[in-house]
């Protein structure tokens, strides 16, 4: 029941009378199916507000990753509603109206948000993890707000998504927040369709949500958010290496201006030469001021740093900065990033200076996510740990981008940028899983005309990478409700991914390493004209059983001819040359 003066009601003649003696408006109804990025971005509350603004009745619900809407009211109001559904969508939403069909009018007196449904087929889209929005940052820094300095503040426009979803539909019981019971105040926000935290599944506050804890190797402990933060800052100021749990796993943090701290981190990890990323303070009013004191950023690089993924961006270092020369030895570029979670904002703003922020792992492995595992495996690396008790369902390392020819190019996909969903320019006859190469592994699932790429996993020469690799393959199929019927793998017979493909029992298709690289350079919409592609990429198994390196390939994806290459030479150590280039240099001397 509703109020007919505020919510248009049906009469027996399917008309709306707004004033006595006026011509009734004919009531119509439509059913809409909306796909795209509509999960975890506040889309249903937006639909509710839009419908009530236009005086429409009906309902909206989630169904396995898509949104279904029934609206009823004046025809012109429904037309405007459909237009604004796309034009005024929340900033992080990417809605697409897949179907809009006439529906029977019925006894609908108000607009409601219904419980999610798992019935029927759907076009599932899994949301990535989202950086902290400006509204939450304002509350985080407002002493009058009940979430002041709360490290896990979030709303429908920000917070973890992919790394806490256990299954779909995206509802709180299906996430790692299921174990945190909402307090009365949070529950009131969660159930209020006009609140920006309506059905914000990671919703929490200091009274009912996750909390921090600190422990160091010397026995120092601190419980409670503020005490743990103070202890962490003190450890960093003392030159310690601290493992800090974020959204997709742990970082190893240390003072970016201390040669001694950075050297200790390199020796312990061990990571003797590879560059390390640096995280900078980012006050809401001027988020780029600090980083611009240290690096030169082109306009597109600035946009990248502030983009929703909040990636690591490669940038040219300014001369004479106080950053440690051990961060990127021998290079004039460093990877810079901004805080992406409330916890990182608090740490960087309290510390007041840049911090090295590298993945907390054993080099080459996926980032660690479990509190106990970090305590055990990084005891010789980290002097202290800043834990929290919100479980991370799956690891997601930081994404890495650089600007090439004024265009953002991913070097590594990860937290905030994945799952990366793409449309294919063709239709697949059966679902396919592509399992990637041996180094810097990533996997992809494709079906119909859709493609989903996983986060970066790591090098496949260790047990943990293989375990995460297998978990990722299972997760993608489970989350998207798709079972692969064919596997595509690298042609190299010795790769762990090839051996997995052999054990899978699925029909297999092997692809030469350099053929795969060549295919990525092609514009599939350019027709059948042949491409000449130069693939200069370390070593890869070739058609003749040798290890290829610099190749010139002519053709198009699926049909390549090797028309030129570097002169073959003996390779001391075989594939070790891919990680130790001096071996190639020695071979040609």
Regions from the PLM with identified roles:
Residues 117-504, 546-549:
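Active-site-adjacent structural elements in enzyme catalytic cores
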Residues 99-101, 386, 509:
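General small-molecule cofactor/ligand-binding pocket signal
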Residues 498, 554, 589:
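Hard-cation-handling environments
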Residues 3-202, 206-213, 226:
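Intrinsically disordered, low-complexity, mixed-charge
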Residues 522-560:
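Phosphate-binding/catalytic loop of phosphoryl-transfer enzymes
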Residues 490, 505-517:
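Conserved phosphate-binding/catalytic loops in two-lobed NTP-binding clefts
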Residues 278, 284, 387, 464, ...:
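Glycine-rich phosphate-binding loop plus the immediately following alpha-helix
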Residues 40, 429-436, 532-539:
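Two-metal-ion RNase H-like nuclease active-site motif
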């Amino acid at each position: 029941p509703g109020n007919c003066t505020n919510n248009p009601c049906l009469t027996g003649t399917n008309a709306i009378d707004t004033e006595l003696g006026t011509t009734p408006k004919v009531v119509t109804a439509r059913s809409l199916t909306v796909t795209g990025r509509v999960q975890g971005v506040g889309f249903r509350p937006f639909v509710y507000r839009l419908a009530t603004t236009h005086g429409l009745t009906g309902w909206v619900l989630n169904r396995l990753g898509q949104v279904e809407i029934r609206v009823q009211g004046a025809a012109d109001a429904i037309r405007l509603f459909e237009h604004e559904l796309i034009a005024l969508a929340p900033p992080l939403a990417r809605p697409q109206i897949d179907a809009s069909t006439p529906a029977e009018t019925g006894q609908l007196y108000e607009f409601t948000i219904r419980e999610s449904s798992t019935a029927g087929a759907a076009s599932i889209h899994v949301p990535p993890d989202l950086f902290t929005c400006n509204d939450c940052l304002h509350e985080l820094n407002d002493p009058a707000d009940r979430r002041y300095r709360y490290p896990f503040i979030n709303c429908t426009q920000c917070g973890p998504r992919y790394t806490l979803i256990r299954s779909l539909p995206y509802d709180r019981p299906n996430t790692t927040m299921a174990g945190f019971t909402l307090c009365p105040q949070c529950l009131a926000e969660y159930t209020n369709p006009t609140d920006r935290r309506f059905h914000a599944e990671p919703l929490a506050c200091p009274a009912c949500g996750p909390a921090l804890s600190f422990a160091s190797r010397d026995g120092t402990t601190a419980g409670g958010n503020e005490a743990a933060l103070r202890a962490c800052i003190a450890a960093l100021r003392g030159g310690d290496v601290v493992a800090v749990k974020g959204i997709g796993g742990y970082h190893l943090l240390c003072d970016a201006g201390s040669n001694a701290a950075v050297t200790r981190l390199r020796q312990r990890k061990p990571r003797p030469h590879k560059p390390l990323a640096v995280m900078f303070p980012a006050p809401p009013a001027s988020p780029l001021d600090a980083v611009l004191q240290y690096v030169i950023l082109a306009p597109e690089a600035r946009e990248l740093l502030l983009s929703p993924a909040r990636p690591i961006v490669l940038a040219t270092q300014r001369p004479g900065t106080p950053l440690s020369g051990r961060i990127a030895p021998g290079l004039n570029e460093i990877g810079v990033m901004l805080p992406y979670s409330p916890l990182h904002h608090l740490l960087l703003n309290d510390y007041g200076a840049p911090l090295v922020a590298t993945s907390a792992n054993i080099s080459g492995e996926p980032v660690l996510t479990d509190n106990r595992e970090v305590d055990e495996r990084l005891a010789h690396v980290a002097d202290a740990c800043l834990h929290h008790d919100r479980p991370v369902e799956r690891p997601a390392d930081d994404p890495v981008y650089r600007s090439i020819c004024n265009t953002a190019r991913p070097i590594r996909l990860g937290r905030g940028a994945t799952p990366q969903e793409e449309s294919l320019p063709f239709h697949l006859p059966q679902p396919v899983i592509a399992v990637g190469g041996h180094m810097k592994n990533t996997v992809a699932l494709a079906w119909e005309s859709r493609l989903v790429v996983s986060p970066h996993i790591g090098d496949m020469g260790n047990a943990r990478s293989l375990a995460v690799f297998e978990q990722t393959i299972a997760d993608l199929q489970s989350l998207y409700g798709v079972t692969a019927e064919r596997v595509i793998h690298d042609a190299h017979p010795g790769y762990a991914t090839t051996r997995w493909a052999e054990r899978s029992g699925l029909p297999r298709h092997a692809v030469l390493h350099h053929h795969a690289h060549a295919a990525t350079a092609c514009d599939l919409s350019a027709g059948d004209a042949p491409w000449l592609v130069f693939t200069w990429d370390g070593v890869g198994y070739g058609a003749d059983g040798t290890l290829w390196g610099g190749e010139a390939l002519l053709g198009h994806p699926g049909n390549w001819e090797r028309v030129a290459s570097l002169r073959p030479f003996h390779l001391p150590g075989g594939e070790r040359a891919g990680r130790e280039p001096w071996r190639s240099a020695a071979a040609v001397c």
